[in-house]
């Protein structure tokens, strides 16, 4: 029963990125795209390695990781001998995941797909392969020696949980499994913020990744499902918006990769879009240039960066500038979400609005959200006071930004999975064999508060 002493494995599979690691660590050991490249039917028996990512591999998320890719064999897609992936035969599997999948798909032998769309698994066969490579090749561990904490989006269908259980207990033979709602884990991660004085599992989580933005109210660790709202604006939409602006200007490089780099390195949220336009018009130094080099560094392209620096993340607050399909600003959606909750929990939901995910990392994102949301709340209170003739005590609106924000869900899972009681809340292989996959429809809540 060595699994009782081994750290739990924490896996956060998002639409855009997957984060892998062990409980108790401050950051995931591996972060790479949730992508898989599978061999085309006519290329299932490749001999020359054409299209294989021989030079580029998934990289560890921190220096000195023992699972670095230095032993990667580009011709086979596996690790060299004398390791778990060799033991399990993953070096013979004709597919790649993560960054290696992106490279392999550039050749004629492989096709690229993303098994998760808008937070939900769409292709379970590809997802199982993705997990298999994640466990044996990157984490280099035996599932029967570890408990696993996996994350899920809000309102995930129970049938999806059962599918996960079947894969992890039957295909991987894992010791135990816990499936946690991402919003609850994000709340736990926010405890690292200096603004948080009470380790509460009550709050409103704004989780914005690559594919979708969720606004999720949580009361004492339980998600208020009827009030959840989804916003069809996230990181990928911002990248595409930047790309469209670059194309309109006829820039030298308008690739998605360049747009993504500009988003990550140059974009910020401004307090007033009209004033920001005026600042740029008066001060040319606010414009920037981005240099794009090819892989051999023999060609250079210069891309001018202008208004998209503040226009791109502005679509959260003025979505009409990018699309006519969705017109409700994020602060309004947050207010509507909280107002749809029971009145006795609203104060706590306004007072603890937690940001999670890479698309909330723009400079001054939290400050702008707090200002706009506070304005909405104050206007409602003023109108209520006018109609009732009474004086309100007001509502404290607080948006929490913290240093673990980018990997908040994974870090929250790491915090909770390292507790002494975690394994007691997991469902084990024995439970699965006795009760079947429906046992994972419910998990007991952590007594963390």
From Swiss-Prot:
Its main location: cytoplasm. Component of the Arp2/3 complex composed of ARP2, ARP3, ARC40/p41-ARC, ARC35/p34-ARC, ARC18/p21-ARC, ARC19/p20-ARC and ARC16/p16-ARC. The keyword Nucleotide-binding applies. It is found in: Cytoplasm, Cytoskeleton, Actin patch. Present with 6650 molecules/cell in log phase SD medium. GO terms for cellular component: actin cortical patch; actin cytoskeleton; Arp2/3 protein complex; plasma membrane. Keywords: Actin-binding, ATP-binding, Cytoplasm, Cytoskeleton, Nucleotide-binding. GO terms for molecular function: actin binding; ATP binding. Signal peptide: none annotated. One of its GO terms (biological process) is actin cortical patch organization. Functions as ATP-binding component of the Arp2/3 complex which is involved in regulation of actin polymerization and together with an activating nucleation-promoting factor (NPF) mediates the formation of branched actin networks. Seems to contact the pointed end of the daughter actin filament. Belongs to the actin family. ARP3 subfamily. This is Actin-related protein 3.
């Amino acid at each position: 029963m060595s699994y009782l002493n081994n750290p739990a494995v924490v896996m956060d599979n998002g639409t855009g990125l997957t984060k892998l690691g062990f409980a108790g660590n401050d950051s995931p050991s591996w972060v790479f795209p949730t992508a898989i490249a599978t061999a085309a039917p006519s290329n299932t028996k490749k001999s020359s390695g054409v299209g294989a990512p021989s030079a580029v591999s998934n990289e560890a998320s921190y220096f000195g990781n023992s699972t670095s890719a230095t032993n990667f064999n580009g011709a086979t897609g596996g690790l060299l001998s004398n390791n778990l992936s060799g033991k399990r035969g993953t070096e013979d599997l004709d597919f790649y995941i993560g960054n290696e999948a992106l490279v392999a798909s550039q050749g004629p032998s492989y096709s690229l797909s993303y098994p998760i769309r808008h937070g939900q698994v769409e292709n379970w066969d590809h997802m199982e392969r993705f997990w298999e490579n994640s466990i044996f090749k990157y984490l280099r561990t035996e599932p029967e020696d570890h408990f696993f904490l996996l994350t899920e989006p809000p309102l995930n269908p129970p049938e999806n949980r059962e599918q996960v259980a079947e894969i992890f207990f039957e295909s991987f033979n894992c010791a135990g499994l816990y499936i946690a709602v991402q919003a609850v884990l994000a709340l736990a991660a926010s405890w690292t913020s200096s603004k948080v004085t009470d380790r509460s599992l009550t709050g409103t989580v704004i989780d914005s990744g690559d594919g979708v933005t969720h606004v999720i109210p949580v009361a004492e660790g339980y998600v208020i499902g009827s009030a959840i709202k989804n916003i069809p604006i996230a990181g990928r939409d911002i990248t595409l918006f930047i790309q469209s602006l670059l194309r309109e200007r006829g820039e030298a490089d308008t690739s998605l990769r360049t747009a993504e780099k500009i988003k990550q390195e140059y974009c910020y949220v401004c307090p007033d879009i009209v004033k920001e336009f005026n600042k740029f018009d008066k001060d040319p130094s606010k414009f920037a240039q981005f240099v794009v080099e090819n892989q051999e560094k023999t060609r250079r392209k210069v891309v001018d960066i202008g208004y998209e620096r503040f226009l791109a993340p502005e679509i959260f607050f003025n979505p009409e500038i990018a699309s006519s399909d969705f017109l409700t600003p994020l602060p309004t959606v947050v207010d509507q979400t909280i107002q749809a909750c029971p009145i006795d929990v609203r104060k706590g939901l306004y007072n603890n609005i937690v940001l999670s995910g890479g698309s909330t990392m723009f400079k001054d994102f939290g400050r702008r959200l707090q200002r706009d949301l506070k304005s909405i709340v104050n206007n409602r209170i003023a109108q209520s006071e006018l109609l009732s003739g009474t004086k309100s005590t007001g509502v404290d609106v607080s948006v929490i930004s913290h240093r673990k924000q980018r990997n908040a869900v994974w870090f929250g899972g790491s915090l909770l999975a390292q507790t002494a009681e975690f394994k007691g809340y997991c469902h084990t292989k024995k439970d699965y064999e006795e009760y079947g996959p429906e046992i994972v429809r419910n998990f007991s809540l952590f007594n963390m508060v």
